[in-house]
Amino acid sequence: MGNDEYTKKLEKVIQELIRPIKNLPFHLIIKSLSGYEVDKFNPDDENHRITLEALKEVARLSCRLINKEGIKRKRANEVGNDIEKFVKEAFIKFDYKADKPTTSAGKKKSTGYPDLEFCVLDNQYHYLECKSYNVKNMNSSMRTFYLSPAKDFKITHPGIHFIICFEIYQDHREDDFNVYKTRGWKILDAYNLDIDLKYEFNSDNRRLYKPDLILAEEDI
C-alpha cells in the first residue's frame, strides 16, 4: 500500500472516530466499565423509599448549610466544586455514612465520577453525584455531566446512582468574589440518563517537548 493510500485510509478512520456517539444509556455504560449493575430506583421498594427520604433530609440540611456560609467563587460554573463538602457534612450530621468512593485498588479517590458513596441503611451502599445549576440554563445543551473511563474506577458494587442538584444564585459580592446561595434542590435517578461519547486527542510532556518539535528556546 502506497503512502498516499495509507494516509487517505487513516484520515477516514480519524473522521469516523471523531463523530460523537449520542444517547448511550448510562446504566449500560457503567455496567460495561465496572462490571456492576446500576439499580433503578423502585418506588415500591421500601428500602429505596427510605433511602430517598434520607436524601431529602440531606438536601434540606445542605441548603441550610450552604446559605449560612455562602459559596465564594468568581464564576457560577465553579460553584459545583464546593457543593460536595456541604452534602457530606449533612450526611454526617444525620449519622449516615458518606465518603469518597473506594476504588478497586482499595484507595479513596476524589477525582472523577461519582463524588460520594453513601449508606443510610446497614450495608446498602449507593452512589451520589453533586451538581449545581442555574434555573435559566435548565434547557441548555451545555455539557454539565462527565464520566471518564479509568483503570482504577470508583464503582465497585451495584447500587442506585443518585444525582443531587442545587439551584444556585448570586446573593452578593464580597472581597472581589461572588457569594452564591441556593433556593432549591432536585434529586435525580441516573439510571435512564442518556449520555454522549466524544473522543479526545491528547499527548504528554515527553512527546510535546521532544527536540525535533522545538523551534527556539532560551534560558534567562
Over which residues does each language-model region extend?
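Short, hydrophobic, well-ordered secondary-structure elements
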Residues: 80-88, 161, 165-167
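Interdomain/boundary linker segments immediately adjacent to catalytic/signaling cores
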Residues: 1-86
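Short connector loops at helix/strand junctions that flank enzyme active sites
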Residues: 111-113, 123, 158
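Non-catalytic C-terminal interaction segments of nucleic acid-processing enzymes
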Residues: 190-220
